[in-house]
Amino acid sequence: MSDDASRLPDYLGHVQQAIERIARYTSGMDEAAFRRNTLVQDAVIRNFEVIGEACRNILRDEPDFAARHPELPLSGAYEMRNALAHGYFKVDMGVVWTTIVNDLPSLLSAMRAVAVAIGSGLKS
């Protein structure tokens, strides 16, 4: 890392905020409603891109932290970001929905726990 102060709390906060936005945008929806609403799809994809970019920054700038926290799917989040950002109209919304339902709640919990552990001041 450079001589600048650690950006880790910022990156963790970006992930948390993006997950919370996705949850808000999809609240009350089932998969069929999500598939019909391209506006929500676009907003969700944008926030997945934020998650992936923040995870890439953690991997790049804080490799020791990343190594100490294998429970955080940092590489997977970045890979998903790349698939979404470069997939254009080939994105599988079923995979996106499954990720929202099955993976984001546990990722949010893990990010909050890590943030509390490092004292970043994020909401727990």
Where are these regions (language model features)?
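Solvent-exposed interaction patches of small proteins and small membrane subunits
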Residues: 1-124
